[in-house]
Amino acid sequence: MKFLSSLVVLGLSAQALASPYVDHQATKDQRDVNVFKQVLQDINLDVQKFDQDITQYQGGDPTVLLADSDAIIKTTEEGIQRIGPQPPLSVTEALALVGPVQGVNKLIMKAVDHLIEKKGPLVGGGYGPQVKDSLERQAHAASKLSELVSSKVPSPLAPISKQLSDQVAQALQKGIQAFSISARQATKVKREATKVQRDISAFKKVIQNISLAVNKFNVDIERYVGGDASHLLADGNVLIKATLDGVQSLQNEPPLSSMEALALVGPVQDLSNQILLAIQNLIDKKEPLVQAGFGGKVENNLRQQEEAAQKLSELVSTKVPHELADISRQLSDGIAAGIKKGIDAFAGTGPAPTTSSTPEASTAPAPSTPPQTPEDTLVPATSTPAPGPAPTAPDSSMVWPTSTTASPDVQPTITSSGTSVPAAPTGGNSSPAVPAFTGAASANQVSGAVGLAAGLLAVLAF
């Protein structure tokens, strides 16, 4: 029925906001949508009886089928009276309607298909016009209720609501058409309707595999009381693999129609709820996980899950009809928000990065030749001196001399090759011999500690 499709799109849109904040409004949702739920339940019961009686029908008087149809019409009209006074629905409030709407929607499609299969005995008995008239009255009542429900939908969702209402209304129209055309044409309509289930089977399989992985992850989280959490990381890796495998398997799937996308709402809703529950349970176990040294590992695993989920989301968005693109994005954002909540909870809980007091260059192989710009490196004179007085060498502690010497002063210089050689004597100057290197005003200003540091840097430089 048309109004059911409106509820379907509401449910899909509500699912798009399936985030950690939904639980906060759970009580309000149950109160506001209770009337809608009750109408759905009543229609579900009537359609279920209609379908059962159709299945059992073998020919002859179809009074029971016509009575079932009248009951559906009556329940629909009563639904109009009950829903009329209700305030407009928010997107979040529609979340609780997704499951019931999906159940009724599938049941209506099945009942119409079963009715078409009974066209032979119904038309053969002369009851074709009566069945057609009954279906037309159902469609009229459904149209009125659809218009009412559409008035309860937020305006941004109105175009999608109308489209989905028209598509679901085609279920009844298909039945009307089947009793107005040949059996061959009716069979063709039936065959085209079956295509929906075939096209989405790959998507359902991916969702199912991920759901199984999330469920195992959640069960192990609930059982965890402390200590080694390697099995939780393994569960996370299985979940990541299932997600990436899904990306691979869906690459070549054709785009989804609106109705095909709607058929995935129920499974996606269940998966989203599973993910949110698992993340919350994981956060509840934060203290023992961090104490056991697994905080950083959990954070890293969640980041990998987030990356895999993003890849799947990007792929699925290319398969969704344009008119559902925004809702698809909101849906993926809701799931991503759940994972991000876990990442934020464990952020910074891992061990601090290990810092080394030795520069990274010290771990590299020694260069075959010294650097070409040695002026920034403190290097003692170590090369063979040129003819002339030998330069004053540093002692074993690498502390440059600071006392006055009677020998001629020699100031070592650094050649372009980086080799330290003594300069020519400066003469009978009585000032101390001071090694020349950039950054030191004079040897008298270099303490023993600084000299030691200079020596160490010189060694490290080579």
UniProtKB/Swiss-Prot annotation:
After translation, how is this protein modified?
A: Mannoprotein, glycosylated.
Per the database entry, which stretches of residues form a coiled coil?
Answer: none
Q: Where does hexadecanoate bind?
A: S313
Please tell me whether the keyword Signal is annotated for this protein.
Answer: yes
Impact noted for substituting S332A: Decreased binding affinity for palmitic acid
InterPro entries registered for this protein in UniProt: Cell_wall_mannoprotein_1
Query: Per the record, which residues fall in region Disordered?
Result: 346-429
Task: Indicate where this protein is primarily found.
Answer: secreted
Any one Pfam family here would be HsbA
- Provide GO CC annotations from the record: extracellular region; fungal-type cell wall; hyphal cell wall; yeast-form cell wall
Any single biological process term in GO: fungal-type cell wall organization
Signal peptide region = 1-18
Presence of the UniProt keyword Plastid in the record: no
Q: Where is the composition biased (Low complexity)?
A: 347-366
Biotechnology note: An enzyme-linked immunosorbent assay (ELISA) with antibodies against Mp1 protein as well as Mp1 antigen-based ELISA can be used to detect infections caused by P.marneffei (penicilliosis).
Keyword annotations of the record: Cell wall, Lipid-binding, Secreted, Signal
The subcellular localization recorded is:
Secreted, Cell wall
Q: Which GO terms describe its molecular function?
A: fatty acid binding; structural constituent of cell wall
For bias type Polar residues, the affected ranges are 399-420
Subunit-structure text: Monomer.
Function text: Constitutive protein of the cell wall. Binds fatty acids and may thus serve as a fatty acid transporter between P.marneffei and host cells during infection. Abundant antigen target of host humoral immune response.
Protein's recorded name: Cell wall mannoprotein 1
Tell me the organism: Talaromyces marneffei
What gene name does this entry carry? MP1
